[in-house]
């Protein structure tokens, strides 16, 4: 039914698009550090014919005297103003100046999300990420782009590869260099590009640990960082148990691999890791696909500290919360839930289902006979997939080798209709 409704709305929108659109639109013009001189003719015409222009002080200062429209600086917080932008001047278009490509971690994407593509027109400039790749000699399609404008520094930590990192301000390079050094990646090649594309462009390079120990005092607020990360031995799809800080409460590597397969991560999805222990499932989930995030629920405060430390060590976005289901309230809605502990707590599974959207997935692992019996009951009610895993390790037995069995794991996975 929902799909039919969406098609109907789309068809209606297509029909409306054939008629002249007289309602005001938001025109977002990307501008670089070279100011008006670097703009195409269509962008210059838009700005010169504007009736009102919004932007940050730095972006508005890039406009020249040929732009005569009133200029309005973004307040802080900015979102309430964005939500009512068209209320300001309903008889004419609203113009916005933004850095580089407004659709790359920029305000253009936010405005389209708020108003839809029919009411937002974007005239992009060359992005700072593309300019940085050009200076470094890197192919853009082989380079990850990470934004730290509104994200914690550790989310730009990687175990190998390369990335262009969008900075929040002048303090970002030193903070990222310190994070890399603190997680054993001090030899990462670290390049800071300031005022890129403008007359004051400056590029400085060095190992991350040198930047962390003695960061320059004159870094420009307008900077971007190119990092070739120091690789390490843990670059596979499933990390060894020793890569995590843990107290023994960890989903072992072999079971973690089959659990990730059952969870089936997709780009941008959010996981709830319930009974997280060391956070190994949450960490592996976030590493598995671009944009994946996780919320880890764990009762023990020391384990919560370990989860946070593991997230920082692997540069992933894991929000750590307390006991489940008490701390479910206020957490972002999950796409997928994994239950690795606490299965026999009264009402836990029901609470998990209550927070999953239609099409959401749940995977639960059981070690004890009691929790296994619970999964069998749920399988009889909702079907899904019920599996049991038993693996063995080869160990010395006298002068020979014997097989030592590990504890069997029962796993139930189901998708909501």
Locations of regions flagged by a protein language model:
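Class I S-adenosyl-L-methionine
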Residues: 1-123, 130, 152-153, 291-294, ...
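A contiguous loop/helix-start segment that scaffolds small-molecule binding in enzyme catalytic cores
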Residues: 2-28, 41-42, 92-94, 162-249, ...
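Class I SAM-dependent methyltransferase SAM-binding "motif I" and its flanking Rossmann-like core
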Residues: 34-35, 99-161, 326, 335, ...
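Conserved alpha-helix/loop element of class I SAM-dependent methyltransferases that forms part
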Residues: 252-267
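Conserved class I S-adenosyl-L-methionine
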Residues: 268-277
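Glycine-centered, small-residue-biased loops immediately flanking beta-strands
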Residues: 269, 292, 360
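Conserved SAM-binding loop of SAM-dependent methyltransferases across substrates and taxa
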Residues: 278-290
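S-adenosylmethionine
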Residues: 299, 304, 319-394
């Amino acid at each position: 039914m929902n799909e039919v409704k969406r098609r109907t709305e789309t068809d209606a929108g297509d029909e409306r698009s054939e008629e002249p659109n007289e309602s005001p639109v938001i025109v977002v013009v990307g501008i670089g550090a070279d100011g008006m001189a670097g703009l195409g003719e269509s962008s210059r015409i838009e700005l010169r014919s504007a009736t009102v222009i919004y932007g940050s002080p730095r972006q508005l200062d890039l406009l020249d005297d040929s732009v005569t429209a009133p200029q309005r600086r973004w307040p802080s917080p900015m979102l309430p103003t964005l939500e009512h932008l068209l209320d300001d001047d309903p008889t004419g278009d609203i113009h916005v100046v933004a850095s580089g490509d407004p659709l790359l971690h920029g305000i253009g994407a936010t405005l389209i999300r708020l108003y839809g593509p029919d009411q937002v027109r974007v005239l992009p400039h060359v992005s700072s990420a593309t300019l940085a790749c050009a200076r470094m000699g890197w192919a853009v399609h082989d380079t990850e782009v990470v934004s730290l404008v509104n994200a914690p520094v550790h989310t730009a930590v990687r175990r190998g590869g390369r990335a262009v990192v969008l900075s929040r301000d002048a303090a970002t390079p030193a903070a990222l260099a310190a994070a890399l050094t603190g997680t054993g990646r001090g030899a990462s090649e670290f390049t800071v590009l300031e005022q890129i594309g403008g007359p004051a462009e400056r590029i400085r390079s060095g190992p991350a640990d040198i930047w962390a120990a003695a960061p320059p005092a004159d870094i420009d607020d307008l900077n971007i960082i190119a990092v070739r990360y120091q690789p390490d031995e843990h670059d596979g799809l499933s990390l060894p148990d020793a890569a995590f800080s843990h107290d023994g409460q960890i989903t072992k590597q072999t079971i973690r691999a089959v659990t990730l397969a059952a969870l089936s991560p997709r780009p941008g999805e959010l996981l709830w890791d319930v009974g997280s222990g060391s956070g190994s499932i949450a960490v592996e989930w976030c590493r598995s696909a671009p944009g994946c995030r996780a919320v880890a629920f764990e009762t023990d405060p020391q384990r919560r500290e370990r989860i946070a430390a593991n997230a920082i060590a692997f540069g992933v976005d894991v929000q750590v919360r307390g006991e489940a289901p008490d701390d479910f309230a206020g957490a972002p809605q999950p796409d997928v839930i994994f239950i690795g502990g606490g299965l026999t707590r009264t009402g836990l599974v029901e609470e998990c289902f209550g927070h999953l959207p239609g099409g959401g997935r749940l995977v639960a692992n059981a070690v004890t006979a009691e929790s296994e019996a619970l999964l069998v009951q749920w399988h009889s009610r909702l079907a899904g997939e019920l599996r049991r895993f038993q693996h063995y390790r080869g160990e010395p037995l006298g002068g020979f080798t014997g097989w030592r069995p590990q504890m069997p794991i029962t796993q139930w996975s189901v998708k909501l209709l």
